[in-house]
């Protein structure tokens, strides 16, 4: 019952499926047997997914003279388990957990924890990989030399020097919008590379600020950006009744000014796109 409750909590809090965790437990028990008996090729584990009750058993060949107790069983012992057992038969022998000993049990726990860490890393990677080329709001954690560490919620991203706008300065706890440039899978977790200079940042900001851009009525056909200085975007309307430049500028410049503020004063020129 305690194990089942623990798996339910892990499934909810860590977003790791119970089936994956049960698989990790199965592998950990097999590994515990291997460490304890020296081999585990003949070991099988069954786990009830509803109750989390498990049993571990080894398949052993019935022999007249036992040379390898991990793989073989005497006829006398085999017939205690199955009265019809004969020499050469394969008998299933249940292994009780107390036989593993303290070290083997600890090994099982370590394997489970390792699997949980691996699954957490995979879940994080999948989550942020799906956010590549998107803009997110992060919180500046610390400045590491010329790089900036930005907390994105469940993971930190790196804003390297060459992806920073010249003369921009950041302070810890400051909230900033960043463009997720690339997400790399590493043994320590996802490495998330961020940018404040990429033209995609400007495009995504317009998509979030201008409804007509978000729904596709107005298209941003091209962007030329000198980060920190000036950006020029060419826009096109798929609806003759919608002025693409006016939609992006907004009433009294409200929409474009909001983006300029986010880009810390970078000038933005909006023109009609001409093939």
Model-predicted regions and their roles:
Residues 1-275:
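RNA-contacting regions in translation and RNA-metabolism proteins
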């Amino acid at each position: 019952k305690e194990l089942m409750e623990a798996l339910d909590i892990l499934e909810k809090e860590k977003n790791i499926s119970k089936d994956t965790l049960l698989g990790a437990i199965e592998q950990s028990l097999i590994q515990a047997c291997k460490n304890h008996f020296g081999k585990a090729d003949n070991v099988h584990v069954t786990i009830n997914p509803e109750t989390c009750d498990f049993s571990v058993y080894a398949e052993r060949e019935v022999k007249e003279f036992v040379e390898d107790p991990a793989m073989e069983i005497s006829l006398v012992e085999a017939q205690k388990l199955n009265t019809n057992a004969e020499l050469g038969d394969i008998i299933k022998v249940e292994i009780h957990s107390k036989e593993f000993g303290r070290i083997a049990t600890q090994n099982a726990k370590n394997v489970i924890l390792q699997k949980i860490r691996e699954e957490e890393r995979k879940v994080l990677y999948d989550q942020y990989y799906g956010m590549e080329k998107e803009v997110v709001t992060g919180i500046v954690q610390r400045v590491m030399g010329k790089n900036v560490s930005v907390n994105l919620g469940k993971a930190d991203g790196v804003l390297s020097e060459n992806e920073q706008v010249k003369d921009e300065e950041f302070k810890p706890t400051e909230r900033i919008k960043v463009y997720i440039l690339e997400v790399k899978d590493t043994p320590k977790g996802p490495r998330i590379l961020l940018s404040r200079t990429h033209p995609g940042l400007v495009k995504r900001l317009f998509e979030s600020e201008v409804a007509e851009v978000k729904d596709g009525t107005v298209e941003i056909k091209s962007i030329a950006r000198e980060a920190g200085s000036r950006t020029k975007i060419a826009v096109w309307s798929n609806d003759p009744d919608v002025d693409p430049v006016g939609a992006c500028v907004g009433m009294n410049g409200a929409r474009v000014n909001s983006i300029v503020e986010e880009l810390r004063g970078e000038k933005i020129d909006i023109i009609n796109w001409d093939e």
